[in-house]
Amino acid sequence: IYDERGIRENAARLKQAFSWNKGYKEYFAVKATPNPFLLNILKDMGCGTDCSSMTELMMSRACGFSGPDIMFSSNDTPPEEFAYAKKLGAIINLDDITHIQCLDDITHIQCLEETLGHIPETISCRFNPGGLFKISNDIMDNPGDSKYGMTTEQIGQAFKILKEKGAKHFGIHAFLASNTVTNEYYPMLAKILFELAVKLKEETGVHIAFINLSGGIGIPY
């Protein structure tokens, strides 16, 4: 049983909390609760979807999400999924620098009757700072052992390559921890990513269009 009124109230509170930022948008991780009824409620409240598989992309499309209201992040991605995400106009978030070549190599996928053939003008890359991610005296996660994301050197190189291939608007994403209930998590994550944004802007000259603070607001079970 789900509390629709509670879901709508919480979504409205979150939106109001960030009303000072006109570019703010909440992306709900479909994997968390792949329920089309809940997705429709969140769509009605102005949220987008965060997808990591073909199934989640298809569900988002079936619920009426399209374009930049969908963000696609995957770390072991078949070409078909990249092509489908591009077909929907989703923001593609690259987990590995080798994915650039994968995108560039896709020219035609018969089963989708869709051509890609070029790098999207808006693209995102997932960052992994390495080491340990600590809040206060607690270790929240160990990005150094994570399979997700690019190093500082890799993401800088990736931005340069993507810029040369026609990308114009860049995003930065990081997945350092999930279900955190401390107030320290997002300020620390934001500090890491905004400092990286300045560094990448200075080194590559790209336009940093957005930063995705992932991980989700935790639930005190």
Label each residue range with its predicted role.
Residues I1-I91, I97-C102, I106-E121, K160-E164, ...:
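A charged N-terminal "starter" segment
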Residues G6, D95, M150, Q154:
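Soluble or luminal CAZymes and related metallo-dependent hydrolases
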Residues I70-N75, N128, A177-S178:
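A signal for specific C-terminal beta-sheet/loop modules enriched in small/flexible residues
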Residues T122-N128:
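ATP-grasp fold ATP-binding core
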Residues P129-Y221:
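Active-site loop/helix belt of alpha/beta enzymes
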